A protein has these predicted regions:
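Aromatic-rich, lipid-facing transmembrane alpha helices and their immediate juxtamembrane interface loops
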Residues: 1-156
Length: 156
């Protein structure tokens, strides 16, 4: 399929840099999102915070793009069908959203078991085991696509 990467074309040398890009971007999002919530509450201190533990969790977002490419190869192998960019964005957005939910749930479970989980959604209407919030689905959809964009090789 034109434009799709093969396994050998996924540049593993870029993975450490992309891991850092996603880790730092995730940290920034963790600070910005609560800051906007504080503005809505008219708390003009505009506070936001994150945990050092979140860096490797967000860093794993570097794997989303390669996973999306592999899924694209699997869904339409050799069909010659060139998917529209909007269709790919929707497919990838939903895929990344689900993968982020799964990663958040399992990372949270592991951290909670060690008394180190920096988040607890208990008491929120859409939480599952206090580890994920289903109302974050649009945020994870967009975050996955953002990670895909910031880790894409320029010109490719």
């Amino acid at each position: 399929m034109k434009g799709m990467k093969t396994l050998s074309q996924i540049n593993l040398k870029q993975l450490p840099l992309n891991f850092c890009k996603c880790g730092v971007t995730g940290w920034c999002l963790e600070v910005i999102f609560p800051s906007t919530e504080s503005i809505l509450r008219q708390d003009w201190r505009v506070m936001g915070q994150t945990s050092l533990l979140m860096f490797p969790i967000y860093g794993c977002g570097a794997l989303l793009g390669p996973i999306g490419d592999l899924i694209d190869r699997w869904v339409t192998p050799g069909s010659g069908f060139a998917a529209k960019k909007a269709d790919l964005a929707i497919r990838h957005g939903f895929l990344y959203m689900v993968l982020i939910f799964v990663a958040e749930y399992f990372a949270g479970s592991l951290l909670r078991g060690r008394g180190m989980c920096p988040w607890d959604y208990t008491g929120r209407n859409t939480n599952i085991d206090g580890l994920i919030r289903l109302d974050f689905a649009p945020l994870w959809f967009a975050t996955g696509l953002l990670f895909e964009q910031i880790t894409k090789k320029k010109g490719g």
